[in-house]
């Protein structure tokens, strides 16, 4: 088995809320020394063909992926599906259903942005920043607020207006854990808990989440992640060992101007953990 030296299995393109095309991401990953890469756009597989072609041209090993939105106990929890078959009908239908709920949410968010800031044309402004009109999300509104001079950065836009509990946040009921994991497994992929350190759960709630996740067929957890500090990595190393999960590593890169770290700029997995690539070797597309 080939063990990658610098895998990055979580990032976003303009097909969801990133700012670069899949080909630009593949080139950036190669330049950063990433040797196993996955594009994991939110609730879509639209960019995967472009990503595969670009990864091959850049000489980078490639895994298919998508980041699915779910709701668990009224909190949005993201599940990354790695190694999925992009042609699977059940996965495509499930993602279509999730995306269909995004436009009404975006229109309500636009109404709140206009009410709170006095800036008109918020929906159209966010849409200009969205590479996929079916996937208008909070980062697109953040970029609109920066464009209009209301905020100096996307992070300020989230802190003032768009984060959970802020005046322009619109809660949403996404897919269930069972649905998302089912779609991923039906498509031949592995369900991986994305950036668990970001969720506002107590230790007991965290245990219940992973008990349900593994019972439903979840097999991986992001241990090394741009959102995780040293303590988070310690906690989720323990979770991986306790529940027998494979460990993943991802930058969650969105944009050269907005992301805190570049593709691949992460510490290695802690010793003793099994990387998700060990279970997905047969789904990895190696460069020729």
Predicted features along the sequence, with ranges:
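Structural recognition of alpha->loop->beta junctions
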Residues: 208-223, 261-287
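Extended substrate/RNA-proximal surfaces in nucleic-acid metabolism proteins
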Residues: 54-211, 272-274, 285-288
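Short, low-complexity, intrinsically disordered N-terminal peptides in bacterial proteins
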Residues: 1-4, 284-288
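An N-terminally biased module of ancient metal coordination in phosphate/nucleic-acid-related enzymes
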Residues: 1-76, 162-163, 175-176, 181-183, ...
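A short acidic, helix-capping loop that chelates divalent metal ions and anchors anionic groups
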Residues: 90, 258-259
């Amino acid at each position: 088995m080939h063990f990658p030296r610098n895998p990055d299995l979580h990032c976003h393109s303009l097909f969801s809320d990133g700012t670069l095309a899949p080909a630009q991401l593949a080139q950036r990953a190669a330049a950063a020394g990433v040797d196993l890469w996955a594009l994991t756009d939110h609730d879509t597989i639209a960019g995967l063909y472009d990503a595969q072609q670009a990864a091959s041209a850049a000489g980078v090993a490639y895994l298919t992926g998508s980041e699915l939105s779910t709701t668990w106990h009224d909190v949005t929890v993201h599940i990354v599906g790695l190694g999925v078959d992009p042609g699977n009908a059940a996965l495509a239908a499930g993602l279509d259903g999730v995306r269909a709920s995004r436009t009404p949410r975006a229109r309500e968010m636009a109404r709140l942005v206009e009410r709170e800031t006095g800036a008109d044309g918020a929906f159209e402004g966010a849409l200009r920043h969205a590479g996929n009109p079916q996937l208008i999300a909070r980062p697109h509104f953040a970029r609109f607020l920066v464009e209009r001079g209301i905020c100096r950065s996307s992070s300020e836009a989230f802190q003032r207006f768009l984060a959970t509990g802020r005046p322009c946040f619109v809660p949403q009921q996404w897919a269930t854990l069972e649905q998302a994991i089912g779609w991923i497994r039906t498509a031949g992929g592995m369900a991986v808990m994305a950036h668990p350190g970001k969720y506002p759960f107590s230790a007991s709630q965290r245990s219940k989440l992973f008990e349900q996740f593994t019972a439903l067929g979840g097999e991986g957890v992001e241990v090394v992640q741009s959102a995780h500090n040293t303590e988070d990595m310690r906690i989720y190393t323990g979770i991986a060992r306790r529940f027998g999960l494979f460990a993943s590593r991802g930058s969650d890169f969105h944009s050269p101007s907005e992301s805190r770290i570049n593709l691949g700029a992460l510490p290695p997995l802690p010793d003793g953990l099994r990387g998700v690539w060990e279970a997905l070797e047969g789904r990895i597309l190696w460069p020729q």
